[in-house]
Amino acid sequence: IDNNGIMRYIDNVFDLQNYFKLKQIPYVMYNALPNTFNIKIKDFADIYKALDLKRFFKPQTSHYEFVISEKLISSKSDPHPSVKGHQEWTEQLKEFIDANNLRTI
């Protein structure tokens, strides 16, 4: 991801997080697709530090990376999650929500 894309991503997550908190909407975030970026850039690092990572499921990985590594894709020609890929990710996500009491703000 180029620097503009990285900044947009972090800014969007930050803005959405703040909106949910302001409106007292319980939320959990995760990456559907890989989002590797260099947070050594000061502007990125400053905003990244403001993210509430307690509400971010596996922030260093993505659903896509999980299904690829676990071979839970639809087919060799379609890397979308299989039914089992969705189910396993969902179970982990539910466990994360319950373990961290994230159903409320």
Task: Briefly describe each language-model feature range.
Residues I1-I105:
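Alpha-helical cap/lid subdomain in secreted, periplasmic
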